[in-house]
Amino acid sequence: MLFFAVLSVLAVAPAISLLSETQVRYLGHAEVADTIRLFTGSGLPGSEITDESAWDAWIRDQDQQVRARIDRGVEDSISNLILYGTSYTKLPRLESTDKALAATGEVSRAARVRVHALAVALDIASPGERVRFVREFLTLKGIAKQGREQFLAANLRRFTEEQRGYQQKLEEAGKAPDAAEVLLTRGTLYQTRGLSVDTSLLPNYALEDTLRVMAAKGAIAAGKIKRIAVIGPGLDFTDKRDGYDFYPLQTIQPFAVMEAVLRLGLGKPEGLEIVTLDLNPAVNAHVAQVAKNARAGMAY
């Protein structure tokens, strides 16, 4: 895996350097008019806007909403770290999200002591990278040192209540006689949830299987893949399923897809380039640092 990882990082580097030379700005209506006109009458948000001023207001509002969901996703990951993390405390992990709240609806004692443990870890001069990530995030949000523990506890309560709400909706949908209603519920359940940076390994296997089938059918010729775009590579902080945090912060998907392409003979190491696109600036910063380290001869 290391060989392919180094190759991947080297391939990322040119794309990162190009991005650093561009100017980030909002698109004007004139620049997107031809595209959104294709969706007139479709109900797609923003597709009915024809005025430059209205478009500018709408796209800025969308940007604020997305950034708010990114922050909420980080807050969700922090709650998972509190529930299951072992890198900052020796306290036993909680069995599940439900154990975070007592019957009264307040944060349970077992959860409170873990909240306190993380708050204490935040004061350490040289904490682990996840704790440092949390501290920097709270600082950016303007959370004062003396208010950290209260914020973490309130956020954990909010997170747990949301998880219970999702489960309740799924259970109610499961009782419906219409299978389409169940699918609709599952498909829209997380439409407003925070955008977490954590990923799953499973899509990587599915992608490799798909590439293998396409190659077998002749849809992709050997050695023809030269550029790969990974939308939402993510950053494994503490996963939603088990909350493991014993490994360094890492992004796997860019390396997994490139390794699959090389292993299947669909691309050549010397001619493969990968570009990553993510809404979360922390993910983009991580990938940029990976590329910088690679140029300095450091493996990932």
What are these regions, as identified by a protein language model?
Residues 20-182, 222-225, 234-300:
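Class I S-adenosyl-L-methionine-dependent methyltransferase module
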